């Protein structure tokens, strides 16, 4: 694998399409991005910094080491609590995990793109010293159509939001004039306009549209089916893994509201390299440096609980296992930072008497397949066939790429976009594509999936005919993000539960952004805030449990003495 020094000169030659003369290149400063988001921002999307905690220090056990679990841990450690994280797999990261196979290839669980509105995640990355690990892409959303035809939503403009967005939609070559006009009408009649002057009010209006699909809402405002198929379906698939006919209007309009009010919300970033090295790694180090501990390959088999005389439930421990080892983990606070299928397996059946837990079973995950294809040339180099065949210099489209003409809605050449771990000397493109929805592909063998994806890549980039695949990988996830269908938002649970010392975290839980890396990070902040807010009550419960345990031991000792 090429070192950073070796490959740095190779990937700067990535081709840029549709440059707007005189546009200002946006800087990569996360300081600016976070401060920009905190000004006139809905508090549900970017909470204020927490007060310094002065309550009792608590022992916290977290199940799950994804972004939600690690975000919770960072917040709690900063407030002086003791944190242990338990992960059933041999690596951390959850949905943003990656690992290295025996041949040195970095395998990812999905394609991870950082929208400019991921301000809670940027805040976390800055806190742990990972803010330099993001590469800013050109401020344009690129659509690759069949035959190599490139369309764009180009946000590069001297004037910021909302003007830059209006220009992007009016100037796009992805739609015909009639569809652009109808698209503009629909957006003009949306809560997005209110967001410019009243972000919190607009967010409430958007929440109230959860019951309707984005397509139905869009058509009711004059939008066209062509706009859905050529622009909005690929965009919806990227964050939500389902199309506009099946995704809630709340999800799409939440994103649009941020794009309309924050100049850089639509700006895309990608990691320098693999998530394990450049995202999870720095967070893990921060946690360990502050006394937090990771326990890998320890899975939770059962939540142990009891009830008070008044009927209030509380957790007494976690039954954990690692291969043939078993133990009971005890803490003052327990946090389940799982995905949807994970939390369903974990919750005791008796807890479904509470609507909050029963509603979890109304949520389902979306199957997703991530495919990586390594080529012996540069797939997305459309302007010069000879350059696409040489291996001295990386060339092509360096950005997230959308397409309406393939079963993968979004993809990227990671050898260009994330070169530190994915550029290899003497090799070419590493196309990473996300098949969504993955249902039709789940039963297929990996070789057949690779064959079908390769055919679709060639349809999008005819100039890549003749390039060979050197290596491939396929990762299937039966249930990834929860299916954000119309009417599902009320079933998302809060982070605080009816069980006094048991809390939830996860991107599927209640928070005002969508199920995403940003949503996971925000859920962790919310879970930690609830825990700190209940500090005194949790201390009282700890003392009661200790007294009960001492009493039980005394009773047992007296019984033995009598015998």
Curated annotation (Swiss-Prot):
Location of this chain's protein in the cell: Plastid, Chloroplast; Plastid, Chromoplast
Residue pairs linked by disulfide bridges in the UniProt entry: none
GO cellular component: chloroplast; chromoplast
Cofactor (UniProt): NAD(+); NADP(+); FAD
Principal cellular location given in the protein's record: plastid
Keyword check for Oxidoreductase: yes
Gene3D superfamilies: 3.90.660.50, FAD/NAD(P)-binding domain
A Pfam family assignment: Amino_oxidase
Record InterPro entries: Amino_oxidase, FAD/NAD-bd_sf, Zeta_caro_desat, Zeta_carotene_desat/Oxidored
Entry superkingdom: Eukaryota
Any one Gene Ontology molecular-function term assigned to this protein's record: 9,9'-di-cis-zeta-carotene desaturase activity
Protein's pathway: Carotenoid biosynthesis; lycopene biosynthesis
Catalytic function, reaction form: 9,9'-di-cis-zeta-carotene + 2 a quinone = 7,7',9,9'-tetra-cis-lycopene + 2 a quinol
Tagged with keyword Transit peptide: yes
Tissues in which the protein is found: Expressed in roots, leaves, flower buds and lips.
Gene Ontology biological process terms in this record: carotenoid biosynthetic process
Family stated for the protein in its record: Belongs to the zeta carotene desaturase family.
NCBIfam families for the chain: zeta_caro_desat (TIGR02732)
Physiological role: Catalyzes the conversion of zeta-carotene to lycopene via the intermediary of neurosporene. It carries out two consecutive desaturations (introduction of double bonds) at positions C-7 and C-7'.
Record protein name field: Zeta-carotene desaturase, chloroplastic/chromoplastic
Source organism per UniProt: Oncidium hybrid cultivar
Organism classification: Eukaryota, Viridiplantae, Streptophyta, Embryophyta, Tracheophyta
Gene designation: ZDS
């Amino acid at each position: 694998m090429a070192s950073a020094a070796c490959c740095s000169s190779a990937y700067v030659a990535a081709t840029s399409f549709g440059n707007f003369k005189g546009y200002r290149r946006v800087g990569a400063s996360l300081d600016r991005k976070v401060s920009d988001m905190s000004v006139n921002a809905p508090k549900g999307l970017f909470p204020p910094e927490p007060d310094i905690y002065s309550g009792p220090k608590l022992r916290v056990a977290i199940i799950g080491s994804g972004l939600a679990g690690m975000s919770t841990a960072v917040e709690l450690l900063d407030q002086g609590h003791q944190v242990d994280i338990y992960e059933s797999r041999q690596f951390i990261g959850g949905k943003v995990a990656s690992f290295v196979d025996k041949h040195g290839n970095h395998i990812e669980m999905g394609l991870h793109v950082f929208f400019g509105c991921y301000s809670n995640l940027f805040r976390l990355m800055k806190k742990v010293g990972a803010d330099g690990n993001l590469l800013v892409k050109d401020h344009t959303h690129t659509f690759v159509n069949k035959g190599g035809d490139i369309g764009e939503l180009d946000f590069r403009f001297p004037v910021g939001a909302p003007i830059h967005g209006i220009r992007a939609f009016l100037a796009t070559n992805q739609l015909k004039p009639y569809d652009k006009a109808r698209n503009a009408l629909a957006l003009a009649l949306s809560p997005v306009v209110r967001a410019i002057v009243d972000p919190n009010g607009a967010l409430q209006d958007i929440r109230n549209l959860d019951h309707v699909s984005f397509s139905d809402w869009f058509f009711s405002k004059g939008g066209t089916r062509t706009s859905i198929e050529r622009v909005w379906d690929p965009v919806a698939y990227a964050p939500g893994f389902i199309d506009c006919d099946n995704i809630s209007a709340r999800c799409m309009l939440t994103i649009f509201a941020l794009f309309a009010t924050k100049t850089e919300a639509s700006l895309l970033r990608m990691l320098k390299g693999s998530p394990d090295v450049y995202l999870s790694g720095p967070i893990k180090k921060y946690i360990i440096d502050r006394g937090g501990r990771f326990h890998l390959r320890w899975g939770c088999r059962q939540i142990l609980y009891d009830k008070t005389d008044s009927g209030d439930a509380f957790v007494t421990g976690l039954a954990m296992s690692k291969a043939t080892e078993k133990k009971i983990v005890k803490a003052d606070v327990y946090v389940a930072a799982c995905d949807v299928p994970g939390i369903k397996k974990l919750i005791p059946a008796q807890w479904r008497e509470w609507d909050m837990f029963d509603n979890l079973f109304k949520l389902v995950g979306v199957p997703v397949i991530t495919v990586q294809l390594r080529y012996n040339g540069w797939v997305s180099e459309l302007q010069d066939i000879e350059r696409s065949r040489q291996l001295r210099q990386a060339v092509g489209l360096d950005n997230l790429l959308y397409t309406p003409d393939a079963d993968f809605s979004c993809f990227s050449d990671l050898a260009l976009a994330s070169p530190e771990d994915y550029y290899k000397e003497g090799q070419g493109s590493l196309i990473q594509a996300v098949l969504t929805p993955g249902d039709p592909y789940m039963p297929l063998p990996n070789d057949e999936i690779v064959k079908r994806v390769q055919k679709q890549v060639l349809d999008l980039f005819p100039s890549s005919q003749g390039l060979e695949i050197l290596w491939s990988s396929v990762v299937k996830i039966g249930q990834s993000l929860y299916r954000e269908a119309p009417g599902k938002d009320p079933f998302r649970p809060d982070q605080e539960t009816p069980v006094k010392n048991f809390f939830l975290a996860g991107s599927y839980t209640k928070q005002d952004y969508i199920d995403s890396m940003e949503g996971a990070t925000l859920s962790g902040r919310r879970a930690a805030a609830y825990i700190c807010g209940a500090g005194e009550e949790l201390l009282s419960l700890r003392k009661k449990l200790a007294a009960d345990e001492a009493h039980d031991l005394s009773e047992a000792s007296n019984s033995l003495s009598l015998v």
